Structures are given as structure tokens and as C-alpha cells.
């Protein structure tokens, strides 16, 4: 008599002992397992699949693999294989009902036949040690209950899959943070899929269904090109490894995994076939409205939809009960992109600059790299109105040619657990180009954002750049401004406001390479390059200027040297400040520079924002 500890794969807290004689058949063990779990498993005992829980061994690369006994190898007869310790990582996850790569590997082989004796199974065929305490001995895989579906139906709905990419999913293994395929992924044309940490988090929550017997809906959305379709392949792989039924709606066709075999679906089964259409079936839909797919009875099965933020794909589906869980795919970090960049050697010299300009979107950074990133942003700015450029993208957004283009500029940002999001611009460069291109023709509306952008985070993000343009215009025109001298924090009393007259520039602002002695007095100069680090503008014999939109603005390196070249009364620095920061702005280091705060009031507010931008 031996005592075996068995565990049902995928069921938390399901480890249990079974006492049985080693001379009995595997079929007898199945009956004993069913007797111990009458409430968990209601099918026939013969349908249970049993696998040995072997302790892993390390291969040459250090990866844990399942040991395989070869009776012909003399060295294998000298030492028995060990059982899985109950403190091993895989065992701990097993008893918690979670999946694990090594558990998948143990259950990926052929289950033992019920006609074999336990002695033959354990010792003759696998050379296992004698079972003892603090071990897991047998893994039990319970087939899908109440959903026995024929693989190839009598009316020819299904056929055997011959697509090499989809055919390989059952045998694909996770290697580190990668899935390694023998065929190219249709979307990336690569043989590896990088598993982002966000993929795992989103999939865990999206596939979790606490209401057994009820359908589960989930929506995964995000910026175009961020990898939602690749994520669908990751979810497909996970469900297949867990031997779940999956129906994939893909551009290459309809693919169905019945729990053991990958098939191609030539026509959907009848919507009245409740044996097929049941909550345990996961339908994976990419960029299509599930409610409008002919023949899909979406109310009878679980559905995961991946789509860009668009009402025509998500809106109607989101209305259906039970309400879908919505997840927002995050932008890629620079570190994540660096991980996959070696797969795109043609982008090696440009991808980091493209990331700085276009944000964390792999399609734009690594794949579609023919167009210069600044030219791409300029084209988007020119094609879209200001209202388009401050449109709050959401799952209820209407999609047209302009909204597709504007999503080059506007991205969806999300953080774990990826249930909430905010809209952000692709980069600082994107914001600069929006303001620069709209300043000529939409100046009044841009200026109106300075005082009326509350509630629109995109408009608020632009305000700093708008203020720079607006302040430069005011500076060029000259006039009387409220100002105050800045002193160190040790001074107890803040000096009262006064007024200062800034002379009107004798000519329109002049572009200069740098500050030089002898430049014309009462002439406003600006640097010719955006990376000039000293001061933003200067007027000989008056002083230098910094456009400032925050409390923490510091004096740039080289400013003191530039100010010294501005002649009599020129060795002073003026910070041009919006009303929000004028009163609280303090003197900056180096404090040897004479510093002043100038109040630049916002223009009179006229609310010219269209209602659509605030929806």
C-alpha cells in the first residue's frame, strides 16, 4: 500500500491523499481520485488525465526541464528520479490553483493509460523513487465538463488546421520572458513574442471569472501600434496551455482549439448549439464589434475584445451585460523597447531618437521607420485642427481619417492595474509642434486656452508652450508690466510690487547664434536653436529673459556669462511668469545674479473651445 498525494491542476486547495496498492491499475487510481472529489468532478473517472509530478532537473542553460527516463541509458538505472517537493515553486502555485510553466510542461505529454499498473508506471517506465511525505506525486487534469464538442462536425464546420503558425501553439514554450515560435508571427514577422509584465497582469484579470457558469467579457484597448493584437496571441497561448476552448477571430481566418487540437473553422456552428456555445468557450476578437459578427451568439460565450479606442468597435459591446472589464494597454518604456530592439536591426541607429519624438509605440519606433519622426508629427499637426489636437481620446471616440492621424500625437497612458488611463501627448516635441503650427492661424484660440483649460489635461499640457509664444509676443511689443525684485529666502519681508517699462523692440525679434558684445540696444534677440541652454531671449542694455511656467524653474548654465555681455543695466535676469506662479516664485541659484519676476497676465478669456474637445 502506498500513500499518493494528488493535486488537480487549476483548482486551488485540491491537494489530497489517496491510499492504494502499487499493484493496482491506473484506472483504479482514477476511480479513487473521483471518489475523493465527487463534488469537483462529475464526469466519468476514465476521462481523468494523470501525469507524474517529477522534480525538475536543470538543462545546460540552467532552465528547469522535465526529466525523461531512457531505459537503454545505463547511467539512468543508477539513480531514481525524485518526486516534486511540496515546497517547490511549481507545487506552491499548483495548490493555489495558479498556472506555472513547469506544470504546463509536466502535463504537455501523453497521459498514462488506465490499463497500466502503478508499479509499471512509477518504476518500470519512469524509474521513480518510492513515494514519501512532503511530496506531490500525481497531477490530475480534469477535462472540460459539460462541453464535449466534436472536433470535426458532421456538416464540415471544422477542418484540421494546417496554418504552421497557429498549429504550433500547443508546443510553444515560455523561455524567460519570451515565447519562441518556429514560424513567423503574422503581425511582427518575427519568431519571438516578448511577454511584457503588463500582458500578464491584464490577462490574469481579464480571464478571471469568479462567476462559474456565467459568461465573462473583457475589453483591451490602447494607442494604435502599442501591441494589442500581439497581446491577443499571448492570451491564445495561455488558454491553449491551460487546455481551455478558444475561438480566435483573426485576419487569417477563424481558428478553434477544442482543448487538445487546433482546428480551422470554416463556418460557425448554429447559435442554438449550446453544447458548443457555452461560458467556458473564450472568443478572442481583434478590432471587430462582437455584437455585429454574423453567427456569433456573444451572449452565450465569454469574449475578449482588443481594439483601438473607437465607438464602432467597443461602444455597443460595452453596453451588454455583464459589463465588460476594460483594460488599457500601457505605452512601452524605453527599457522594454531596448529589450526587443535587437529583433529590428534596421532600426538600431534611429529607434532611441524616434522614441524621444514619438513615444512608446513599437510600430512607430521600430517597425515603420521610413518617415522622419519630426516630419511625421508635423504632418499630423498640419492635417488636424486645434480642436482635433486637444481631443480627449476614449473608447467612445468616433473614428475618421483625422482621428486616426491625431493618435500619432495623442496617446493613452496607463499604469498597473491598467483599469484607468489618462491622455497624454507623444512627447515634448509633439506639444511644441502643435503650438508652433497653430500659432499662425489659431493664435486667439490658443491664447484662450491659457485661462480656460480646466478639465482638459491635453489643453493644460499645451499651456506651458503657449505661454512661451505669448510671452515672447508681449515682450517684443514692450509696455508696462507689474514686477518685483527677487531676494533670498532669508529675507523676512517680500518687497512690494512695482512696475517696469520694457521698451518696444526696434525691429521684430532677431535670431542670433549667441549673445555677443555690441549687439543693438532696445532690440529683442532670440537664440537660433532650441537647445541653446543659457537664456530664452535678451535685450542689450536691459537684461535677459526666461519664460517660466513653474515654481522650480532654475537658472540655466551659462546665463551669468551671457548677462555680463549685455552692457550697462543688462546684467540682470527677468523671469516672465503667469499669474499662477508670480506671487510664490523665489530667487534662484546663483543668487549673485540680480533677479526679477515679471507678471504676464493671461489674455482676456473667451471660451472658444468646441464642445467636442471636452466630451
UniProtKB/Swiss-Prot annotation:
UniProt entry keywords in alphabetical sequence: Glycoprotein, Host nucleus, Secreted, Signal, Virulence
Glycosylation-annotated residues: 531
- UniProt short sequence motif HVLVXXP motif, positions renumbered to this chain: 137-143
Determine if Transcription is one of this entry's keywords.
no
* LQLFLAK domain, as annotated region: 18-54
A Pfam match: Crinkler
Q: Where in the cell is it found?
A: Secreted; Host nucleus
Q: Segment DWL domain: which positions?
A: 55-136
Q: Which GO terms describe its cellular component?
A: extracellular region; host cell nucleus
User: Can the keyword Nucleus be found in this entry's annotation?
Assistant: no
Cleaved signal peptide residues: 1-17
Q: What does this protein do?
A: Secreted effector that elicits necrosis in host plants, a characteristic of plant innate immunity.
Free-text note on domains in this protein's UniProt record:
The CRN proteins have modular architectures that include a signal peptide, a conserved N-terminus, and highly diverse C-terminal domains. The conserved CRN N-terminus harbors a distinct LXLFLAK motif, which is followed by the conserved DWL domain. A highly conserved HVLVXXP motif marks the end of the CRN N-terminal domains and forms a junction where diverse C-terminal domains are fused. The conserved CRN N-terminus mediates the translocation into the plant host cells.
Its family remark reads: Belongs to the Crinkler effector family.
Q: Could you identify this protein by its name?
A: Crinkler effector protein 15
Organism (species):
Phytophthora infestans (Potato late blight agent)
Organism phylogeny: Eukaryota, Sar, Stramenopiles, Oomycota, Peronosporales
Amino acid at each position: 500500500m502506498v500513500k499518493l498525494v494528488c493535486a488537480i491542476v487549476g483548482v486551488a486547495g485540491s491537494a489530497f491523499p489517496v491510499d492504494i496498492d502499487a499493484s493496482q491499475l491506473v484506472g483504479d487510481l482514477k476511480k479513487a481520485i473521483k471518489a475523493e472529489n465527487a463534488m469537483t468532478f462529475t464526469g466519468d473517472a476514465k476521462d481523468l488525465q494523470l501525469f507524474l509530478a517529477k522534480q525538475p532537473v536543470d538543462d545546460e542553460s540552467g532552465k528547469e526541464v522535465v526529466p525523461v527516463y531512457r531505459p537503454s541509458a545505463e547511467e539512468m538505472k543508477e539513480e531514481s528520479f525524485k518526486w516534486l517537493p511540496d515546497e517547490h515553486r511549481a507545487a506552491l502555485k499548483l495548490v493555489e490553483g495558479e498556472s506555472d510553466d513547469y506544470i504546463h510542461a509536466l502535463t504537455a505529454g501523453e497521459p498514462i493509460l488506465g490499463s497500466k499498473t502503478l508499479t509499471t508506471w512509477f518504476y518500470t517506465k519512469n524509474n521513480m523513487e518510492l513515494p514519501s511525505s512532503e511530496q506531490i506525486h500525481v497531477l490530475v487534469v480534469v477535462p472540460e465538463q459539460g462541453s464535449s464538442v466534436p472536433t470535426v462536425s458532421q456538416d464540415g464546420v471544422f477542418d484540421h488546421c494546417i496554418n504552421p503558425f497557429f498549429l504550433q501553439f500547443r508546443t510553444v514554450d515560455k523561455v524567460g520572458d519570451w515565447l519562441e515560435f518556429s514560424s513567423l508571427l503574422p503581425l511582427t514577422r518575427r519568431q519571438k513574442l516578448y511577454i511584457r509584465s503588463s500582458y500578464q497582469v491584464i490577462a490574469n484579470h481579464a480571464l478571471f471569472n469568479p462567476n462559474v457558469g456565467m459568461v465573462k467579457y473583457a475589453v483591451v484597448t490602447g494607442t494604435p501600434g502599442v501591441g494589442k493584437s500581439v497581446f491577443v496571441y499571448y492570451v491564445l497561448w495561455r488558454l491553449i496551455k491551460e487546455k481551455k476552448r478558444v475561438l480566435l477571430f483573426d485576419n487569417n481566418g477563424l481558428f478553434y482549439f477544442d482543448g487538445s487540437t487546433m482546428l480551422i473553422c470554416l463556418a460557425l456552428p448554429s447559435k442554438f448549439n449550446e453544447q458548443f456555445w457555452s461560458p467556458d468557450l473564450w472568443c478572442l476578437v481583434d478590432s471587430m464589434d462582437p455584437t455585429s459578427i454574423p453567427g456569433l451568439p456573444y451572449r452565450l460565450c465569454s469574449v475578449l475584445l482588443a481594439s483601438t479606442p473607437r465607438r464602432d468597435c467597443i461602444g455597443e459591446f460595452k453596453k451588454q451585460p455583464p459589463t465588460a472589464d476594460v483594460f488599457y494597454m500601457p505605452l512601452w518604456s524605453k527599457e522594454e523597447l531596448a529589450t526587443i530592439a535587437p529583433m529590428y536591426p534596421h532600426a538600431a541607429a534611429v529607434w532611441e531618437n524616434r522614441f524621444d519624438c514619438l513615444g512608446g509605440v513599437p510600430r512607430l519606433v521600430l517597425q515603420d521607420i521610413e518617415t522622419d519622426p519630426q516630419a511625421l508629427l508635423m504632418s499630423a499637426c498640419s492635417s488636424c485642427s486645434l480642436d482635433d489636437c486637444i481631443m480627449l481620446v476614449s473608447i467612445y471616440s468616433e473614428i475618421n481619417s483625422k482621428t486616426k492621424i491625431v493618435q500619432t500625437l495623442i496617446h493613452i497612458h496607463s499604469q498597473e492595474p491598467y483599469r484607468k488611463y489618462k491622455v497624454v501627448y507623444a512627447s515634448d516635441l509633439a506639444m511644441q509642434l502643435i503650438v508652433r503650427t497653430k500659432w499662425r492661424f489659431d493664435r486667439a484660440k490658443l491664447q484662450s486656452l491659457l485661462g480656460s483649460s480646466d478639465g482638459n489635461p491635453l489643453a493644460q499640457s499645451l499651456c506651458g508652450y503657449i505661454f512661451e509664444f505669448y510671452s515672447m509676443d508681449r515682450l517684443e511689443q514692450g509696455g508696462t508690466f507689474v514686477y518685483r525684485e527677487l531676494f533670498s529666502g532669508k529675507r523676512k519681508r517680500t518687497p512690494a510690487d512695482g512696475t517696469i517699462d520694457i521698451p518696444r523692440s526696434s525691429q521684430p525679434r532677431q535670431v542670433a547664434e549667441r549673445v555677443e558684445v555690441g549687439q543693438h540696444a532696445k532690440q529683442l534677440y532670440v537664440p537660433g536653436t532650441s537647445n541653446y541652454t543659457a537664456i530664452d531671449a535678451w535685450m542689450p542694455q536691459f537684461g535677459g529673459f526666461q519664460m517660466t511656467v513653474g515654481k522650480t524653474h532654475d537658472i540655466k548654465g551659462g546665463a551669468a556669462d551671457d548677462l555680463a555681455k549685455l552692457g550697462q543695466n543688462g546684467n540682470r535676469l527677468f523671469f516672465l511668469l503667469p499669474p499662477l506662479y508670480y506671487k510664490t516664485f523665489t530667487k534662484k541659484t546663483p543668487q549673485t545674479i540680480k533677479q526679477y519676476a515679471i507678471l504676464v497676465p493671461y489674455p482676456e478669456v473667451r471660451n472658444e473651445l468646441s464642445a467636442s474637445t471636452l466630451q
